[in-house]
Amino acid sequence: MHIRSLELRDYRSWPELKVDLEPGITVFIGRNGFGKTNIVEAIGYLAHLSSHRVSSDAPLVRAHAENARVSAVAVNQGRELAAHLLIKPHAANQASLNRTKVRTPRELLGVVKTVLFAPEDLALVKGEPAERRRYLDDIIATRQPRMAGVKADYDKVLKQRNALLKTATIALRRGYGTEEGAAALSTLDTWDGQLARLGAEVMAARFALLNELGPKIYEAYTTIAPESRPAAVNYKTTIDQGLSQFSEFDAGIIEATLLTELAAKRQREIERGSSLVGPHRDDVDLMLGDQPAKGFASHGETWSFALSLRIAEFNLLKSDGTDPILILDDVFSELDAGRREKLVGIAQEVEQVLITAAVHDDLPENLKKVLTAQHTVTVQDTGTGRISLLDVQP
């Protein structure tokens, strides 16, 4: 897979950008803050419908603009698809595919497949569980776009359930002794059923993904850091104890176990005013030997583990039949010689690689020799603020 052309309008620092891209390795050179990462972020947004840098859409829209536009023509095994996304900071985003408006932007998932490695990926190892959950969910949505809808539905149910637990605390505590309490408990039962059904689908997909990813993460880490302890990953849930009695389990067993745990935790949830059971509280244990990587890994081991997660993701998507686009955002300056060499080896075998770097010297020498294209990102101050420019001589 590769992107043949990319267009941006009012995306962050880019009032307008039109660039033709080719298979091979393309690098964007520009000083920090000039807007080079905004280019690859936009491609990643088109692939995942989310940014690797911010959690909301508002920062993606250029100051004083009503919306941002991202358009790309992707080529996959000779077939071209034109994806277009309109990002609205205060309303629902809109999308079209081959100039035909689609019902929801989620229909774009899978059109562009990317794997992005950036300094922010250290948070996969050192950060909060939400980072690791998102890592899994993004891969699942790329491979099974329908699951993005399941996850979105789960999040809506969770929000409604939490709102009930917060606003109807007194009624819930009174229980069936009052009409108000009985109504609140009946509503909670309804949300429990939906939370368990949707949550079981999310969890089953995560379990299945980690079963495939685990060996690839182990292999990637062993290749990158052969002198280190072996890497392993385990999915940690809020219902581990309930699931431990089953040697194998599917979504049905997970759903039943969730319902059992929700019943057991109901009083605590009413007292706390929040949902304590479900995939929104799960985590992925990243292990080096018999120790968790978080808190025990050295800086070099943390980089190796983060890189291994992305390489495993890339290899998994590739095994599905399509080379995803590999995006390397300002990472070579952060890696030691050994890790740089491993990454260059991978990049040389990928259909399309997009790289950002602050200066040309940040690139490894063996990478400079195989570049397909190089672009320079500069900036210009205008009456409406600083804007980014591509290949414009000062």
Swiss-Prot record:
GO terms for cellular component: cytoplasm. CDD domains: ABC_RecF. GO terms for biological process: DNA replication; DNA synthesis involved in DNA repair; double-strand break repair; SOS response. Keywords: ATP-binding, Cytoplasm, DNA damage, DNA repair, DNA replication, DNA-binding, Nucleotide-binding, SOS response. It is found in: Cytoplasm. ATP binds at G30, R31, N32, G33, F34, G35, K36, T37. The RecF protein is involved in DNA metabolism; it is required for DNA replication and normal SOS inducibility. RecF binds preferentially to single-stranded, linear DNA. It also seems to bind ATP. This is DNA replication and repair protein RecF. It comes from Corynebacterium glutamicum (strain ATCC 13032 / DSM 20300 / JCM 1318 / BCRC 11384 / CCUG 27702 / LMG 3730 / NBRC 12168 / NCIMB 10025 / NRRL B-2784 / 534). The gene is recF.
